[in-house]
């Protein structure tokens, strides 16, 4: 069931989203060669809690981190640990914060130092595909209009959209209806209504679209070992379009 939020609920979710965005700003300052993903996790957890929120991911189905930290060929759900970031890596950081009972959720892929032109293009195309999807997020549109816009931008540029992981509704639960694929034909699915809150999060591979899960039962990697990127915002559908909630 898709739950439309009241204005009171949206006010809380704006603050949850703001805390997520501020945490991303803080983390970005520390993403540099030599830091471990565990240290980034500690910085994020401290920052989230200092703003009166709790990490959405910590303890979620047994997940041990406060953030997901996925490096290079790791797509999503990377467990923070002793991996040391190196010059030329890329790292996808997924952050969730729960504030007064409601969640905000946003992911971003960052360069570690100087990266190759190829990797920068992957990041640029994935980020732009997110915003191409958001352009379709408006009352009266169909859910899959977002999906189609993302795929139509990324795949003609030589990249592959991951099928197994999708966007989702957000609210008092981190993952709510509806599920939102990042591929497919337009004009399908439920009509968008004001008050819907959605996390749109294209995951794009430089090689094939196929992924697998490592033996830790969390970390998802590309089958061919090529790099991948992940960009996500939580948005609210409004009468006139959409509002990004995960912004500072």
Swiss-Prot record:
UniProt-recorded name of the protein: Methionine aminopeptidase
MF (Gene Ontology): initiator methionyl aminopeptidase activity; metal ion binding; metalloaminopeptidase activity
Catalytic activity of the protein: Release of N-terminal amino acids, preferentially methionine, from peptides and arylamides
Enzyme class, broadest EC rank: hydrolase
Origin species: Halalkalibacterium halodurans (strain ATCC BAA-125 / DSM 18197 / FERM 7344 / JCM 9153 / C-125) (Bacillus halodurans)
Summary of the function given for this chain in its UniProt record: Removes the N-terminal methionine from nascent proteins. The N-terminal methionine is often cleaved when the second residue in the primary sequence is small and uncharged (Met-Ala-, Cys, Gly, Pro, Ser, Thr, or Val). Requires deformylation of the N(alpha)-formylated initiator methionine before it can be hydrolyzed.
Residues binding a divalent metal cation 1: 94, 105, 232
Gene3D superfamilies on file: Creatinase/methionine aminopeptidase superfamily
Coiled coil: none
Entry-linked NCBIfam families: met_pdase_I
Family affiliation: Belongs to the peptidase M24A family. Methionine aminopeptidase type 1 subfamily.
A Gene Ontology biological process term: proteolysis
Entry keyword set: Aminopeptidase, Hydrolase, Metal-binding, Protease
Enzyme Commission number: 3.4.11.18
């Amino acid at each position: 069931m898709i739950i439309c939020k009241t204005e009171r609920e949206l006010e809380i979710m704006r603050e949850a989203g703001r805390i997520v965005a501020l945490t991303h700003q803080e983390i970005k300052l520390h993403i540099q060669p030599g830091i471990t993903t565990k240290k980034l996790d500690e910085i994020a957890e401290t920052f989230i809690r200092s703003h009166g929120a709790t990490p959405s991911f910590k303890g979620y189905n047994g997940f041990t981190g406060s953030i997901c930290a996925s490096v290079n060929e790791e797509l999503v759900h990377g467990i923070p640990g002793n991996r040391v970031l190196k010059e030329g890596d890329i790292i996808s950081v997924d952050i969730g914060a729960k504030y007064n009972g409601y969640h905000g959720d946003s992911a971003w892929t960052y360069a570690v130092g100087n990266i190759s032109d190829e990797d920068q293009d992957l990041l640029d195309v994935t980020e732009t595909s997110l915003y191409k999807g958001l352009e379709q997020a408006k009352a009266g549109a169909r859910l899959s209009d977002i999906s189609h816009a993302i795929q139509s931008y990324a795949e003609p540029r030589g990249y592959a959209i991951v099928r197994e992981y999708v966007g989702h509704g957000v609210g008092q639960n981190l993952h709510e209806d509806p599920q939102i694929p990042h591929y497919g034909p337009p004009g399908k699915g439920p009509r968008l209504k004001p008050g819907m809150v959605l996390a749109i999060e294209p995951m794009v591979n430089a090689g094939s679209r196929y992924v697998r899960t490592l033996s830790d039962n969390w970390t998802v990697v590309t089958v061919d070992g090529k790099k991948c990127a992940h960009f996500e915002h939580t948005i609210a559908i409004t009468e006139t379009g959409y509002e990004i909630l995960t912004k500072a």
